[in-house]
């Protein structure tokens, strides 16, 4: 039994079809990104449908989180939930009648058969024959007689439906891994409908792909073993008039965590929303996720979304597992932070400052002015937006609320009081309060007159201003604070 393949003239249609369970993780979003990038690269369509037939695990909260995650990442779709399209509905829970119609066609065509065996019975038969009891279904019900079926029904048993797997090798060319063959008999007949009549994922997923005209199935490596089943089902669907062609399959590499273990939902870096909380921006995270199995070139790690779309081809995806390296992700994110337009960067800081209760829900005139002045000073110094509140806190709090950190107190000169007195004496007479006059006055008083090294001289003043060992540029920070506040902080630190 054969089925046509797609050809170069077939318009590309890819899909993203998650289950709404848990919170979105980076492996899932990487899959969405690769499908989106391939659709945009080829001028094709991305279909977003939701596999929500598991009532016990699916939730509307998770569904909303999927939408939020994709929207935040800038991954849009051409057809699917929320936007509609010619193949509605796009939630499996609303497609029951469609599946029942296909099931009836498969039954009429003889491609599925009733299976009454329970898991315990299958295991017992394997044991009795000296086989591994975990081998899976043994084909017992494949050719039941009418009498046997009647007997099972008389017992009150309900039958699952299984697809007849062909007694031949199944070979396909994976877009990522090349030619793959599953030997005849290596994949048992599999259930497509539960005894209660509800279709299983093994049926609904390929049926939806067929009816929606999906041309390329790009998904995680963990689903590779199900491909021969889907190819066999596709052939049956073609025979009953449901499928026009067999799509191409591409299995994306595993995303590994620390210690070369597959990235788990329990790993903090796997949570997209936690990465957002840490201060990743979508441009940086999108860039890094694209590197988990693909690259623009051998020596080019930094690229824009436009460059990704222009270059992305699923045939270039690597089959080897990709490791999620948090440090590299942060470094790439920092590069994209520095590429932001100043006003854009300033705006993105606001939610993090609000979360830290450093600014009000509606910025005051003073808060807005401070942020405008300081944003360019920190844009070159942070990798994650969530670093900003700790660095900038001293600019938004009262002078009396600046408390020096322990690490900032270490290494200060023994004559700290003398240093601070000299600093106060140097800047108090200044009539022009700008970075240049402040720097000249402090350099003369602390380095030339007291003979201090710059680190000790300016480190003392920095700690007085910010309470930190590291801060935005010192003299510019003092300009933002103003003369009165700067002197108040020097005196307070001197008198502590």
From Swiss-Prot:
Xref: InterPro entries: aa-tRNA-synth_I_cd-bd, aa-tRNA-synth_I_codon-bd_sub2, aa_tRNA-synth_I_cd-bd_sf, Glu-tRNA-ligase_bac/mito, Glu-tRNA-synth_I_codon-bd_sub1, Glu/Gln-tRNA-synth, Glu/Gln-tRNA-synth_Ib_cat-dom, GluQ/Sye
E.C. no: 6.1.1.17
Keyword ATP-binding listed: yes
Motif 'HIGH' region: chain residues: 18-28
Annotated Gene3D superfamilies: 1.10.10.350, Glutamate-tRNA synthetase, class I, anticodon-binding domain 1, HUPs
Function (record text): Catalyzes the attachment of glutamate to tRNA(Glu) in a two-step reaction: glutamate is first activated by ATP to form Glu-AMP and then transferred to the acceptor end of tRNA(Glu).
PANTHER family: GLUTAMATE--TRNA LIGASE, GLUTAMATE--TRNA LIGASE, MITOCHONDRIAL-RELATED
Subunit structure: Monomer.
Family: Belongs to the class-I aminoacyl-tRNA synthetase family. Glutamate--tRNA ligase type 1 subfamily.
Protein name: Glutamate--tRNA ligase
Originating organism: Renibacterium salmoninarum (strain ATCC 33209 / DSM 20767 / JCM 11484 / NBRC 15589 / NCIMB 2235)
Organism phylogeny: Bacteria, Bacillati, Actinomycetota, Actinomycetes, Micrococcales
